Amino acid sequence: MNPIYQHYLVLKGEQPKKYARDLAALIGISEAELCEARIGVDAVALKRDFPALLKALGAVGETKNITRNAYAVHEHLGEYHNVHIGAHGGLVLNPRALDLRLFVGQWCSAFALQEPTGQGVRHSIQIFDRHGDAVLKVYATEQTSMAAWQTLIADFTDAAATPLVVEPVAAAPLTEAIDATAIDREWRAMTDVHQFFALLKRHQVSRPQAFRAVGEDLAWQTGNDALERLLQMAQQAGNEIMIFVGNRGCTQIFTGRVEKLQPVENWLNIFNPQFTLHLMADQICESWVTRKPTGDGFVTSLELFAADGTQIAQLYGQRTEGTPEQSRWREQIGALRTPGAAA
């Protein structure tokens, strides 16, 4: 048996509640390398034709999909319909169901796992970037067609997969010579929220750097209790919101009402029938409200960041293209200017 896998089993026995990525870190390897070490035991490598793989998932029916970063875990049930994907990017477009934005150019490896658990065998497909970090995990559920799942695994198994070469993460080049006037001017000239990515790239600034550069009518910092306050307001009012959680390779989006909000110790949790969120509220270091111009008026969001600069999550009011933003959402965001009881 592979010594890495043996080490993993020992750690898992000692710390059964830890995620695989955390156990891999304790071993001193990436999660992708841990999966590679499990080949021949409970894992197989899959062909790296990611567009074909995601399109093939349409045949299996319902799956549970997990996209996460170091501070938030976003889980959504859904099916792989409306998959539009190329060599570098794409999307799975099912608002209020499985809704993904895919940065396939970042993807590097994929594995199928069959993990024994106390509740039976857990089947999953796990996709990783070139740094060995998971970008998307797809789990079979009781509603999944296991015959179609097994056919997919057989079709995509790569018995001759090349060994992984995991690259260290390089920090994005950022400038300290910020042209605040130009950033403010270009921000106000936007007509689509997606133009914001180009603005950041042109000026080589992070999102918080851009927020600090513009006027307070476009971006303002609020208390780090803002997420819990906003979710409480949305739950009480029953208006639909959007919650984005992403990493280098994938962003997963929930659209709907907050049904069950449950803080537990340092975790802020949402438990809906089709959607679950686990977010480490004590790791929120900066909370920003931003307003970006579009052809339908301003779109307002709450953006949350960790101390290392990771964007933990982003929230919007539900909005259909071509319609203005919810007035209720704007009122809820506006209430964040007033300190909460915990602030």
Regions found by a protein language model. Give the residues of each.
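C-terminal functional regions that serve as terminal interaction/effector modules
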Residues: 1-32, 38-40, 238-251, 256-258, ...
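An N-terminus-focused feature that recognizes amino-terminal "leader" regions
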Residues: 1-116, 120, 341-343
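Hydrophobic, ordered structural segments
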Residues: 2, 9-14, 92, 99-199, ...
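Surface-exposed interaction/gating patches
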Residues: 16-23, 34, 46-49, 63-65, ...
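Short, low-complexity cationic-aromatic patches
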Residues: 58, 98-103, 116-123, 235, ...
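Generic short beta-strand
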Residues: 65, 125-126, 243, 302
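Short loop/beta submotifs within extracellular cysteine-rich repeat domains
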Residues: 73, 132-137, 251, 309-313
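DNA replication sliding-clamp ring fold and its partner-interaction surfaces
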Residues: 97-108, 224, 273-287
